């Protein structure tokens, strides 16, 4: 029997996949438990429409991320902090502070976890911070830390 998987089934198929399986397995396990539906013409057309919709949505997200990247790479986030001798900061600048300042000054809301800052900024000056906007798009944000 030909079925369309609604969920991932280990060893048999992934969500959205169409596959031939034994009749008993399809009726007694997959369809009964909601893991699959029988592959009729109506179900296949619904599946193709759903895939087109998902592809369109993914393309829109990618375009949005690319536009945001262009905008972000032109910006400089200005932060002020107290510092001692040699430009060393008292404390540090974290990705959370960068995200808050970015939202406050430029109106761009970015999750702090998307900023790839392995260690907090502990010195005055310019720092390039990579920001993962999409799994294919990474922007580089310029952060300038000046003395308070």
UniProtKB/Swiss-Prot annotation:
Gene3D superfamilies xrefs: Ribosomal protein L9, C-terminal domain, Ribosomal protein L9, N-terminal domain
GO cellular component, one term: ribonucleoprotein complex
Disulfide partners: none
Gene Ontology terms, MF aspect: rRNA binding; structural constituent of ribosome
Gene Ontology biological-process entries: translation
Database matches in Pfam families: Ribosomal_L9_C (PF03948), Ribosomal_L9_N (PF01281)
InterPro entries: Ribosomal_bL9, Ribosomal_bL9/RNase_H1_N, Ribosomal_bL9_bac/chp, Ribosomal_bL9_C, Ribosomal_bL9_C_sf, Ribosomal_bL9_N, Ribosomal_bL9_N_sf
Sorted UniProt keywords: Ribonucleoprotein, Ribosomal protein, RNA-binding, rRNA-binding
Summary of the function given for this chain in its UniProt record: Binds to the 23S rRNA.
Similarity comment text for this entry: Belongs to the bacterial ribosomal protein bL9 family.
Protein name, per record: Large ribosomal subunit protein bL9
Gene name of this polypeptide: rplI
